[in-house]
Amino acid sequence: MKITLVNSRLDPAGVTIREQIQVLLADPEYQREGIDWEFLEIDGRLIHQERIDTGLNSDLLIFLSRHTSRRPVPVLTVHPTGNPGEALLGGEAGSFAPAAPGWMQAVLQNLVRLVPDGYQASYEVTHHGPTTLSTPSFFVEIGSTDHEWSDPVAGAAVAEAVLTAAPVDPISLIGFGGTHYAPRETAVALETRGAFGHILHSREIGGLTGSLLAKIATAAEAEAVYIDRKAIDRPALDHLYALLEETDLPVLGEKELHQIGSLSWQEYRSLRQIAGDAAPGAHLVIGTLPGGGTPVTATVPADLLAQAISADQGRVMTAIGRMPVVGLTGRGGLLLPIIITYERYRSQIIHDLITLCVKTIREEQHAVIDGDRLIIKKERFDPGLAASLGVPPGALFGMLKGGQAVRVGDQVIKPEMVRSCTVTAIHLRGLERYT
């Protein structure tokens, strides 16, 4: 792989980073098999270097640059180039350069690990040129004043972050929403496999069009979308969702990105599709499902699962998390009686889930077995009975519900006087196998 490191003689931060990279490359420890580092120093501003990759035959361009800000803070950043709107700082309006999401994520993760005291590290949203490139690229920057631009410690941190970057199975995303330093996207990239190709500031969402979205998706090599919903106003958010409905890009939340684990994106998307067909709108709860298998659905008796969740939802969900399955949750986060697993596990998983439910019910509730029937008896505080005995709603209800006797006038009302009993029978053929 050939990587070209581009800096400008006019840019003190770029010069600092380049010098520190050259120092590190003199050490054999930083020589990496399969990577050929090439330096390219120019005289002009980096943001105006359209088509600079012509004839380079590089696989990746990394622009070494200074960062400026109206509110200068010591910062190390990475970002792709492009102009969602006007081209105020190089490039073309409504144009986006090919991104390198995995490499940007890897460099960002290293920057956070190596960041000097007093500095911060983050993404920046997509902005400025150059945009007319055919080679994937990104900027890595030191900000935001002369002091930081010439700081050899900051330069060394960036140099090591670049030279040791190693993308690991990233999921390429477009990020929508947030401020200039993209705090949520930064957190996602640090904590999950989500790697952003392009990121749009909240103010750009309202002006987004379908054709612009298509350009961004292509330049970002996007597999999915992440939205910082809290950072986008409702009209712009509705506009964005309407545009996304015309694409095949799934929207992934932070929780979902955390759950994907080591599953390949293709495997995860297949599971997501199966879940959508089986229970539209359901959310996935991924257990210990390994990669490689034929995914199938399986069901457990809905009434049995409901009783087990009522008895101890935490126990059931913890067990699901330890099984090679994908659980599905509906409204309110309740587990649905449909699970996804691999075909080779299906029979055993059904047996294990039914056994889990039966044991949970028997251990947490008053339940007995009668042949193929699991009979569950529940006693509950009955507010109707309490009211019929003259107990006013409020604190006395709470005391009775908690097992305390109360006095109403001359009468003592005991908890057992205001309880009603329900009996539920669940039929399970071969129930003895699950006890």
From Swiss-Prot:
SUPFAM superfamilies: AF0625-like
GO molecular function, one term: D-aminoacyl-tRNA deacylase activity
Cofactor(s) demanded: Zn(2+)
Enzyme Commission code(s) on record: 3.1.1.96
Signal peptide interval: none
Cofactor note: Binds 2 Zn(2+) ions per subunit.
Keyword Hydrolase: yes
Domain of life: Archaea
Keywords carried by this UniProt record: Hydrolase, Metal-binding, Zinc
Catalytic activity: a D-aminoacyl-tRNA + H2O = a tRNA + a D-alpha-amino acid + H(+); glycyl-tRNA(Ala) + H2O = tRNA(Ala) + glycine + H(+)
Gene3D superfamilies: AF0625-like
GO BP: D-amino acid catabolic process
The keyword ATP-binding is annotated on this UniProt entry: no
Function text: D-aminoacyl-tRNA deacylase with broad substrate specificity. By recycling D-aminoacyl-tRNA to D-amino acids and free tRNA molecules, this enzyme counteracts the toxicity associated with the formation of D-aminoacyl-tRNA entities in vivo.
Family, similarity comment: Belongs to the DtdA deacylase family.
HAMAP family: Deacylase_DtdA
Assembly behavior: Monomer.
NCBIfam families: PRK14866.1-3 (NF011436)
Name the record gives this protein: D-aminoacyl-tRNA deacylase
Species of provenance: Methanosphaerula palustris (strain ATCC BAA-1556 / DSM 19958 / E1-9c)
